[in-house]
């Protein structure tokens, strides 16, 4: 259960309270009440604590609209976590800049069939209550952990992203829906994100300058100068330019967006990558959260 909880919860919300309660509470997810929050704010989720169920279980509280999610699709969601015993709120992601994502995969189905079944068929606007039993203690000295109630709101349902073809990239570029990369006189990049435009659903590879060296394969080791920004706020989270040297890495050992985005490019190529969350850091890595933008100069291919 800890495995699936780590899939759903950002690290900041992987909290476990250990307080107890002797009051009479609820034993039914139907007793949960929800009051919508303001735009960009979490809803108010109430229940009679302690909430006590025999097993982990999930239930759709509110039906959304649109096509229901099918196996293999990705769900983008926001969530709120509460201690099921005390009712204390542990954290929420509604007020954050980006959605969380999870794939309706066989691994997910095996790890938690109850939640998988609740998310299968869900659509944007669906609200799901998920009661999570704590993991078994790993030692006799480990403190007892309380169950949690997670409340999820489905934001979007998406097919697994793919690498966009040249026609799609050209169309998005012509419509002004792609980020613009500018280099200063020292060759250091900055980005301008199109105002009011959402990140593309698919992986975008926009070649700025084509090289004429060796072509990269999925198993190549490459050296590159690069910078990365979050689509949501345009915040730079990493840059080899600030470190003053290119970085070497194997293409089969990086995020999927880099592997698929750089494979086939030639040494010397300069490129902009727009990478959807599902092909980047699904649960975030430091400040690299959500959909990402990279500028990459491929300086060496081995």
Regions inferred by a protein language model and the residue ranges of each:
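Cross-family detector of peptidyl-prolyl cis-trans isomerase
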Residues: 2-302
């Amino acid at each position: 259960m800890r495995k699936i909880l780590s899939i759903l919860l950002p690290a900041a919300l992987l909290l476990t309270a250990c307080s107890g309660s002797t009051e009479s509470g609820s034993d039914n997810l139907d007793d949960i009440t929800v009051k919508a929050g303001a735009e960009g704010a979490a809803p108010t989720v109430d229940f009679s604590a302690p909430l006590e169920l025999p097993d982990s279980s999930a239930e759709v509280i509110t039906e959304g609209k649109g096509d229901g999610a099918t196996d293999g699709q990705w769900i983008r969601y926001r969530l709120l976590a509460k201690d099921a015993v005390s009712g204390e709120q542990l954290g929420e992601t509604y007020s954050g800049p980006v959605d969380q994502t999870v794939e309706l995969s066989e691994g997910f189905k095996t790890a938690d069939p109850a939640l998988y079944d609740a998310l299968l068929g869900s659509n944007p606007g669906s609200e799901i209550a998920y009661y999570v039993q704590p993991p078994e203690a790993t030692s006799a000295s480990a403190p007892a952990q309380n169950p949690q109630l997670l409340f999820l709101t489905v934001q979007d349902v998406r097919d697994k992203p793919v690498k966009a073809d040249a026609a799609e990239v050209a169309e998005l570029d012509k419509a002004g829906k792609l980020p613009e990369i500018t280099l200063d006189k020292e060759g250091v990049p900055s980005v301008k994100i199109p105002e009011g435009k959402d990140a593309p659903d698919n992986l975008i590879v926009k070649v700025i300058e084509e090289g004429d060296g060796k072509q990269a394969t999925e198993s190549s080791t490459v050296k590159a100068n690069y910078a990365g920004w979050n689509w949501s706020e345009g915040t730079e989270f990493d840059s080899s330019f600030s470190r003053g040297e290119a970085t070497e890495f194997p293409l089969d050992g990086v995020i999927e967006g880099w592997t698929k985005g750089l494979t086939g490019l030639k040494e010397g190529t300069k490129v902009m990558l727009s990478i959807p969350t599902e092909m980047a850091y699904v649960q975030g890595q430091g400040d690299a959260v959500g959909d990402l933008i990279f500028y990459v100069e491929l300086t060496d291919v081995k």
